[in-house]
Amino acid sequence: AHLFLKLSDNKNTAYFYDLNTKINYKVNENNNLYLSGYFGRDIFSLSESLTNTYGNSTLNLRWNHLFSDKLFSNVSLIYSDYYYGLDLNFIGFNWESGIKNYNIKYDFKYYLSDKMKLNFGTNLTYFDLNPGTINPLDENSSINFKQLDKKYALETGWFAEMEQTLSEKLNFSYGFRLSTFNRLGNSTVNYYANDQAVVYNEDLKIYEKGTPISTKYFGKNKSIADYVNFEPRATLAYEIDENTSVKASYNRMTQYMQLVSNTASPTPLDVWTPSDNYIKPQLADQIAIGYFKNFSKGDYSLEVESYYKKIKNRI
């Protein structure tokens, strides 16, 4: 993209950079520590009037423990930070938004036999969302500082999955994930008549914001709304020969974060928001079938997959 930008008469630039690091430390025969980090940014500048910067930062500390030759575990502490920035120099302000995640994961692998393996564990994620911050670029700007209310949420999950070899050619895996989600305070919540935050105007044929009938302040970490969802999943794989296999699967997925947009297509100012009283979690049921074949001793492969997905509560 940067090569084509050079052909323009304007001073347009586009570039990105990534930094990765990983450190391993063997404590003893049964314990290992792993530390990894990532920092990346994509930057696009249009004729010095607009600069778009976005990227991710992550830090992961993992402890691997071997209980026996059949059972081991991983404990992970994960921090991630998604940043989005837009400098509108021709107007005189900067827009920033982002999501910070603090995640703890504890998972196990237990080899019950040569033909059965059990995976299970739990995780907890705390979300710190900044929907938007408007900063004037200089003291003479006509734009005033504005901080949209930050949003907080807590998601927990428990999962179990059995991987089973039914025969030399047939493998079956099945399990579930049980997730809970809490939208947390520190914010004031509006309440609307008939719980309708958005109403349809029959005369204008458009949706309009509802009129609040009351408000309530929720203190920090107080629960505003909560959800519980059961997510089953199963996969059946059959090996026709050493180079050919077919697979069928079903799984249910829950997404508690939704992308809010004022338009039909994504824009730079779209923001992520957690589920609450009025924005329900997005649920998806998916069925998939696939055909896989290797050629020339694995140098080439053919993969054909088809799926049907039913989505509920999408906004």
Regions found by a protein language model. Give the residues of each.
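Transmembrane beta-barrel strands of outer-membrane/channel proteins
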Residues: A1, L35-F39, V75-D81, F120-Y126, ...
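Structural signature of outer-membrane beta-barrel domains
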Residues: A1, N30, G40-F44, S80-Y84, ...
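Outer-membrane beta-barrel translocator domains and adjoining extracellular loop/strand segments
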Residues: L3-D9, S36-G40, F44-N52, G85-F93, ...
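Extracellular loop and loop/strand-boundary signature of outer-membrane beta-barrel proteins
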Residues: L5-N10, F44-L50, T58-R62, L86-E96, ...
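Outer-membrane beta-barrel domain signature, strongest for Gram-negative TonB-dependent receptors
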Residues: A14-T133, D299-E303
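Residues on the lipid-exposed face of transmembrane beta-strands in outer-membrane beta-barrel proteins
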Residues: T21-Y25, L61-H65, I104-Y110, W158-Q164, ...
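Outer-membrane beta-barrel signature, preferentially recognizing the C-terminal barrel domain
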Residues: N52-Y54, T58, R62-L66, K105, ...
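Signature of Gram-negative outer-membrane beta-barrel scaffolds
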Residues: L124-D241
